[in-house]
């Protein structure tokens, strides 16, 4: 992706990026909680698989008609590209994608969580960047990587992802974002089977499953 507005490494830029990453950590916790809550509630109130899928389909169609766009159906790659390369995203896009994803996946439709996570991170970062004095395009890139790091608890993989998607320019800044998001996202994760072996805040072996 061709992103713009990568700042020089300085105390100001590090502070701005740390603030955005901290916000992304909060959003990552919220995403994990929404996914877990919706999964348990759909299983509880709609135990029949076929009925659950039917209800989910009707709800998604209704929501799509309500918002007046299909941007939140499917992977949403066009929206991700617009946020990264044009610095454009609707302020509510990240929340709507979170809602659409939770309903779609947890009512039984097949699909992954990772690309929707990219969507949520990129659109949130693009929107929040302006409040922190960052370029929206660069903010979208930071948001994508930081949110991904928060939900998968894999900082090294997230740094490598930033290099793969955006090249080596600003790699230290992406590393800062990943570090902050990882530290502040707690022990939440998209996958409850994930084992977190060590504490994020102290040198302690904990061996717990992600929440």
Which residues does each predicted region cover?
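Alpha-helical transmembrane segments and immediately membrane-proximal extracytoplasmic
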Residues: 1-211
């Amino acid at each position: 992706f061709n992103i713009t507005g990568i700042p020089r490494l300085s105390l100001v830029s590090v502070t701005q990026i740390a603030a955005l990453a901290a916000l992304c950590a909060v959003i990552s916790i919220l995403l994990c909680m929404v996914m877990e809550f919706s999964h348990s509630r759909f299983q509880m109130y709609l135990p029949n698989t076929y009925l659950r899928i039917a209800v989910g389909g009707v709800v998604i169609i209704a929501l799509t008609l309500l918002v007046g766009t299909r941007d939140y159906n499917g992977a949403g790659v066009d929206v991700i590209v617009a946020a990264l390369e044009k610095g454009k995203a609707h302020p509510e896009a990240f929340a709507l994608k979170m809602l659409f994803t939770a309903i779609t996946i947890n009512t039984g439709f097949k699909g992954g969580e990772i690309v929707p996570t990219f969507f949520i991170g990129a659109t949130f970062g693009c929107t929040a960047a302006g409040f922190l004095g960052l370029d929206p395009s660069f903010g979208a890139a930071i948001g994508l990587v930081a949110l991904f790091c928060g939900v998968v608890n894999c900082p090294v993989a997230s740094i490598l992802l930033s290099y793969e998607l955006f090249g080596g320019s600003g790699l230290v800044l992406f590393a800062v974002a990943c570090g902050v998001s990882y530290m502040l996202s707690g022990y939440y994760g998209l996958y409850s089977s994930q084992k977190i072996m060590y504490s994020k805040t102290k040198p302690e072996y904990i061996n717990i499953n992600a929440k």
